[in-house]
């Protein structure tokens, strides 16, 4: 399997919401994602919910790009292809994966460049 088979013609949705990545010491019930590690918990929340998060550090201003396709576990290099393509246009990424797909977060001010680059790879980007 080649990542380009999934990218070419694959749909990518752009979130209406803007997210913040927060370092905290507990879960948040409305979090899009929670990652627990020894010594810290990271939650990704909509910026409108920031007041409810007791965070020691906050990185606001992230838009979520969701690859609306089921990505098989044996697919090698998909995220590498996406991250490399976005790095070529100087777009930093924050990545989360679910069981079936990937979510790539980009800074709000870099969204236009990210969308253009994904479209150049053959993705259909939907708002």
Give a label for each model feature:
Residues 36-38, 96-100:
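Short glycine-enriched loop/turn motifs at secondary-structure junctions
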Residues 76-98, 109:
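A structural feature that tracks compact, well-ordered secondary-structure segments
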Residues 66, 94, 105:
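Conserved beta-strand segments that form the floor/walls of ligand-binding pockets within enzyme
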Residues 41-45, 100-107:
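A generic structural motif
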Residues 63, 89-92, 102, 121:
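Generic beta-strand structural signal
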Residues 47-50, 107-112:
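Helix N-cap motif at beta-to-alpha junctions
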Residues 1-85, 117, 121-127:
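Regulatory modules associated with amino-acid/nitrogen control
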């Amino acid at each position: 399997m080649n990542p380009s088979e999934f990218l070419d013609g694959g749909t990518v949705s752009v979130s209406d919401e803007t997210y913040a990545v927060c370092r905290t010491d507990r879960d948040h019930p409305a979090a899009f994602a929670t990652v627990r590690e020894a010594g810290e918990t990271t939650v990704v929340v909509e910026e409108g919910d920031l007041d409810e998060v007791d965070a020691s550090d906050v990185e606001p201003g992230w838009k979520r790009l969701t690859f609306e396709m089921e990505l098989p576990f044996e697919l090698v290099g998909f995220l590498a292809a996406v991250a490399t393509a976005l790095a070529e246009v100087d777009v930093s990424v924050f990545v989360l994966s679910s069981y079936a797909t990937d979510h790539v977060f980009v800074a709000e001010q870099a969204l236009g460049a990210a969308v253009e680059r994904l479209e150049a790879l053959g993705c259909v980007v939907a708002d």
